[in-house]
């Protein structure tokens, strides 16, 4: 038996989905332990290209049981749309290979409305929400003003609970934002259209996981986004509304006593970011556009162009410390092949002093990157499958990053395909 978490080290979009897809061949269960449909994992395999937002990445592997844990923001509408799209591409999804925690709270229709209304109110002070309802959902969850997926199995209790929440929520919609209220008929129609579709997948996943653990099954846990978007340890307030770090994995998965034997942190060979907030190494203009095009840096959920720049050693080292990573997967090394020199942010300058420490969020906008560079390799490496066959300059770059971040780089990806990963 082993428990392994795969997590993002930076701002998200590091390539976690394809790493889970790769290593899940050796695992029996994959659990998504936090977040909602506001970010995506991209996986390329024999069925095609998939942008997964809520479904665990193990859904693309036969024989793997996939679980949406109690820490997930369960958006029935988005989940069913995603399930339908994946099934249309030839992937089977049944209650045998997808299980939804009865303790996962439901993202309700008004959560999206409130997200958009608040972003509009904030105007130029907005945080860059994806408008998927995530912040209003988690706010309601911690106010105990939402419902659990398991309540869909008990309709009479569900309607009584929803009626009380509806009255309270309409006060916010009408009196704070001047928006249209919801009715019970609206909610019943929503449950009939989307809630009923996911009911066959809802069960006591905690009991399932405890049994799997007792049987010595291998369990993988995955999250969305990265360390710098964690609610407590990220660049607040430009974070998501949940804890993405590996320490939360046992709690959000439904197996709170689990010990993590391995934590694989995923780092991109350069930096990218979607949304607002400080991004010390950001490039602009032609330089940024060239890297963005080379890496296909557009949000899997929103399609928005990602902000890009060179690898940030300071932020990466901090992200690894937050996650407690035991191994690193360095992704998209091949994207850098067009560069004559590979730029690296080695340190920050803050208040006239150079520092290796990641600053407190309030002063991070004042940090300036201190740059260095290494020779590029200027050749296609997408077909390389052995470490020793990489150009010397590429190996030197990987080894430099490894030394600076203080964690072994076990995996190096050189392309989007399932087999385009070098294991060191």
Task: Identify the meaning behind each predicted range.
Residues 1-424:
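Non-transmembrane, aqueous-exposed alpha-helical and coiled segments at domain scale
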């Amino acid at each position: 038996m082993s428990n392994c978490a795969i997590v993002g080290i930076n701002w998200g979009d590091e390539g976690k989905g394809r790493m889970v897809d790769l290593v899940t061949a050796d695992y029996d269960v994959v659990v998504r332990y936090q977040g909602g449909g506001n970010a995506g994992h991209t996986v390329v395999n024999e069925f095609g290209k998939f942008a997964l937002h809520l479904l665990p990445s193990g859904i693309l592997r036969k024989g793997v049981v996939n679980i949406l844990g109690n820490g997930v923001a369960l958006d029935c509408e988005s989940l069913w749309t995603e399930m339908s799209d994946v099934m249309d591409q030839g992937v089977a999804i049944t209650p045998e290979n997808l299980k939804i925690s009865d303790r996962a709270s439901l993202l309700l229709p008004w959560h999206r409305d409130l997200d958009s209304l608040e972003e509009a109110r904030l105007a130029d002070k907005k945080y860059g929400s994806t408008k998927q309802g995530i912040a209003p959902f988690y706010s309601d969850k911690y106010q105990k003003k939402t419902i659990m997926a398991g309540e869909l199995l008990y309709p009479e209790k569900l309607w009584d609970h929803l009626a009380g929440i509806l009255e309270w929520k309409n006060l916010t919609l009408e009196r704070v934002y001047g928006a249209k209220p919801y009715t019970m008929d609206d909610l019943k129609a929503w449950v009939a259209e989307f809630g009923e579709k996911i009911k066959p997948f809802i069960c006591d996943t905690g009991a399932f996981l405890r049994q799997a653990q007792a049987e010595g099954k291998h369990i993988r846990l995955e999250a969305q986004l990265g360390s710098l978007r964690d609610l407590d340890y990220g660049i607040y307030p430009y974070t998501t509304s949940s804890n993405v770090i590996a320490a939360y994995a046992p709690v959000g998965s439904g197996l709170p006593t689990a010990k993590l034997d391995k934590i694989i942190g995923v780092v991109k060979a350069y930096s990218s970011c979607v949304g607002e907030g400080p991004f010390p190494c950001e490039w602009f203009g032609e330089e940024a556009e060239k890297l963005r095009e080379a890496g296909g840096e557009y949000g899997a959920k929103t399609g928005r162009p990602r902000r890009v720049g060179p690898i940030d050693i300071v932020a990466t080292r901090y992200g690894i410390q937050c996650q407690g990573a035991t191994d690193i997967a360095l992704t998209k090394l091949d994207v850098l092949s067009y560069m004559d020199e590979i730029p690296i942010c080695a340190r920050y300058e803050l208040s006239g002093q150079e520092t290796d420490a990641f600053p407190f969020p309030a002063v991070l906008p004042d940090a300036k990157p201190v740059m260095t560079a290494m020779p590029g390799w200027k050749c296609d490496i997408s077909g390389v499958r052995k470490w020793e066959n990489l150009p010397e300059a590429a190996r030197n770059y990987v080894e430099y990053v490894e030394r600076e971040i203080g964690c072994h780089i076990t995996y190096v990806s050189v392309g989007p395909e399932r087999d385009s990963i070098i294991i060191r």
